[in-house]
Amino acid sequence: MKRPFKRILYGGDYNPNQWGKEIWKEDMRIFKDARINSATINVFSWAKIQPSEETYNFTELDEIIDMLSRENYDIVLATSTGALPAWMVKRYPEVARTDYEGRHHKFGQRHNACPNSPVFQKFASRLAGKLAERYGDNPHVTCWHISNEYGGECYCENCEKAFRVWLREKYQTLDELNKAWNTEFWGHTIYDWDEVVLPNALGDGIEDAAEPHMTAFAGISIDYCRFNSDGMLNNFKMEKEAIRRYDKETPITTNMMGTFKGLDYFKWAKEMDVISWDNYPAYDTPWSLVAMRHDLMRGLKDAPFMLMEQTPSQQNWQPYNSLKRPGQMRAQSYQTMAHGADTIQFFQLRRSVG
């Protein structure tokens, strides 16, 4: 594998396709003035690249990559699979997630695909492979960015079937499963693998629980979380394998989220060439907590990591977006470097149109 980076990367997510091309040239000028040397692109462009099941269109992405290559940028190229296109949900409704309440979703938002959908896996792997085939030999592509901020859950029939398979591989026998879950409690003894149901509001979920997604059986809940993490990791590995068919050397990553509990990051780290994560402290987040998260990320591989995202301004999911005081963004970035980062990147280099 190639050495991840020959220089400290300074840049961030760049989505020029949101703007007219007359803005692109100006971006290159002002980015150079700001000494920006890298851009993360194509994070949410699946619908643009693949407007229908049979059609791929790389024309605009070709232009963006050519422009950045001419300016000697390090390109972090994403696979776009963090948000699937509307046509896929319309034609294959099973790719959409079913939530904890048992509601099957329509198209919308992001992180919106069932991780155990064979249809989603097929299209995601195919797209990753096509991107690697087209751009894998570009020397300016210095890192592959698979999907985006893996997380969330699905409780559909595909997931339930996959959960049973996962449990059989783990426990081998129903006796071992019943023992591990203490199913004697409340008369929950399982006599057939098909009797296992997902731990959501339609099954063992506790109504009006103090914490969301609580269930009556901790063992079932913990195993579901492990299964869900493994399922998403399997998707990451599928895309990684598709990339490696055409690009054997460029480092591959996905952006983690610090102390996010939903995934087993220690297990994920074994499959990643370099760790990357997104740092979005709130106005009242202790700096010591941010430091601990940096150390956690560095410790996953005992090696330098990438700061894939941070922001000088706002996030659409924070209850409050406080203005950072003068020098605070610089101090936050220096703290990141001091804890072992090889990159300082932002979301976004140019704000969205709306």
Regions found by a protein language model. Give the residues of each.
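Boundary/entry segment of secreted carbohydrate-active catalytic domains
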Residues: 2-23
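Short, well-ordered coil/turn segments that N-cap beta-strands
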Residues: 5-8, 35-37, 69-75, 137-142, ...
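Conserved, mostly hydrophobic/aromatic
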Residues: 12, 31, 39, 68, ...
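Short, solvent-exposed turn/loop segments enriched in Gly/Ser/Thr/Pro and often Arg
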Residues: 15-17, 42-45, 78-87, 142-151, ...
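Aromatic-lined substrate-binding rim segments of carbohydrate-active enzymes
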Residues: 25-105, 129-132, 236-246
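Surface-exposed, active-site-proximal loop segments in enzymatic domains
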Residues: 45-59, 87-118, 157-160, 217-221, ...
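Polysaccharide-binding and catalytic clefts of secreted carbohydrate-active enzymes
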Residues: 102-274, 278-292
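Hydrophobic targeting/anchoring helices
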Residues: 253-354
